[in-house]
Amino acid sequence: MLRGKRVAVTGHTSGIGKEIYEYCQFNGAEVRGYSRRSGFDMKDRNGDHIINDILRLDAEIVFNHAWYPRVQNKILKILHTQWKEKEKVIINTGSATCYYSIGASIYESDKAELRDYCIAKATDYPYKDKCRLHNVSMGWTNSAVLEGVEEGDYFIDPYEAALVLINLVMPQNYVMTEIVCNAKFKPMKNMVQLRDKATANVIRDMQLEVKQPWEE
């Protein structure tokens, strides 16, 4: 499934992205990771350097995992447009927050746009568009967004979350365009800390040091 394939993973140094990257490496893929540590900060150049490098790599499989305001959607849309005539796969890490709001509007609207784009383009595959798209709206995962929250059985393990995404690589006689992968829920009174801390972490990560073009 992965051996010998050219694979790109954004956000490959922690959480789900790290698990995807290591799984692909172990299974013989030619995998390239994109993160600040590898010189590909999503804040830089609105993600253009990442997109250009993935195009130069001519990746066959892209795990569009990392999020930054507007950039994750930009990566999806440009790669998809460029690859309409090629048998590629783009697997996006969305968020269940586009179904169950936590109050982080930019994050949630970005993730909803990611989902909606994949669903809208699904009717073109494969007769008009050979590039296959998937989106997984992922629930609470033990990752950076929950930093500071005590671990509990309501988290999805990052390795298990990675497998949900990786299993979409193999072509089937059907296409699972959108998947909602929920963690286990508890009564809302027990989820308040989780929700509030996640919201604070997302908002913190959205506080940009430099004003970006989409804010003007």
Please provide the spans of the model-predicted regions:
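C-terminal helical subdomain
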Residues: 135, 150-216
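Catalytic loop of short-chain dehydrogenase/reductase
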Residues: 84-128, 139-143, 150
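N-terminal Rossmann NAD(P)H-binding glycine-rich loop of SDR-like oxidoreductase domains
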Residues: 7-26
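Conserved Rossmann-fold SDR core element
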Residues: 125-141, 173-178
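Conserved catalytic-site loops of classical short-chain dehydrogenases/reductases
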Residues: 60-63, 78-82, 86-94, 131-134
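Adenosine-cofactor binding site in Rossmann-like domains, unifying the SAM/SAH pocket
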Residues: 31-53, 67-70, 74
